[in-house]
């Protein structure tokens, strides 16, 4: 009788354990977050440092998918900061600088195919010039709604004139004039992008990465309504209490390998 009773308990335990999936029994560990910085995507072979071939770019997206790297946004990053907890698994934020026309012709279709979202930092003065995206294309992308009801393409500021923000300071005769220059670069670019996208612009990417962590530049960003500054400092986000005005990134260049991306995520 005792043996029969033990056998029944064993069968019940087995049935309970069989209902627990591997994911439930082994929750994912908190991972890292990497901000990937692209510029121009080209068909065929890349011919300079800041170009990436469409084939390599697509392989990057496949790498993210294959390694279950969640593509998130800067708003998600703010929620992580507020919660004080890193998300389970690794994450990536896709960003693009300047405004090359390849964003519309190459990047947009690939992101839609792989169901990924991205932030595009505009060099506002150059929009509509040769080889750059135009405002009509910016509007089309920013207003696009995916099948899940989300808008996957967000436009943000890379300044108005793409000037060095900190290194330009000695050229101004007074602090007041320098701050007026900063307000123009932050404010005018923000207002123009918002007028074409009907979306709040609160993310800024530093031209040339110049001025990362500088108090005056951060103050100018804040008074012009920004909540984030993406820098060009190489690194991954490993702590939820990140300085949102000094966000590191990883430039993706013509010869960057997916192994390098993986190394920042401990893969």
Predicted regions located by residue number:
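Positively charged n-region of N-terminal signal peptides that target proteins for export
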Residues: 1-5
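Bacterial N-terminal signal peptides
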Residues: 8-16
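N-terminal pre-catalytic segment of deacetylase/amide-hydrolase enzymes
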Residues: 19-92, 249-254, 262-267
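Short, electropositive alpha-helical surface patch
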Residues: 209-227
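A cross-kingdom marker for long, charged
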Residues: 233-264
């Amino acid at each position: 009788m005792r043996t029969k009773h033990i056998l029944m308990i064993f069968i019940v335990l087995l049935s309970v354990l069989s209902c627990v999936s591997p994911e439930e029994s082994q929750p994912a560990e908190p991972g890292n977050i990497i901000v990937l910085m692209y510029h121009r995507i080209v068909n065929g072979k890349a011919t300079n440092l800041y170009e990436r071939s469409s084939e390599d770019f697509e392989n990057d997206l496949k790498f993210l998918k294959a390694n279950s790297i969640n593509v998130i946004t800067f708003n998600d990053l703010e929620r992580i900061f507020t919660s004080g907890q890193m998300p389970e698994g690794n994450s990536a934020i896709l960003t693009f600088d300047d405004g090359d026309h390849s964003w519309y012709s190459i990047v947009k279709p690939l992101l839609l195919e792989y169901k990924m979202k991205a932030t595009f930092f505009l060099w506002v003065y150059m929009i509509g010039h040769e080889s750059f995206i135009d405002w009509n294309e910016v509007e089309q992308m920013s207003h696009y709604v995916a099948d899940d009801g989300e808008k996957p393409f967000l436009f943000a500021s890379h300044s108005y004139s793409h000037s060095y923000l900190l290194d330009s300071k000695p050229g101004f005769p007074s602090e007041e004039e320098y701050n007026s220059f900063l307000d123009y670069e932050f404010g005018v670019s923000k207002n123009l992008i918002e007028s074409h996208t009907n979306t709040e612009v609160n993310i800024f990417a530093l031209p040339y990465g110049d001025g990362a962590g500088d108090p005056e530049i951060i103050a100018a960003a804040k008074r012009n309504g920004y909540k984030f500054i993406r820098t060009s400092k190489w690194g991954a986000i490993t702590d939820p209490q990140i300085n949102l005005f000094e966000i590191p990134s990883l430039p993706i260049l013509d010869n960057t390998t997916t192994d390098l991306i993986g190394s920042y995520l401990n893969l």
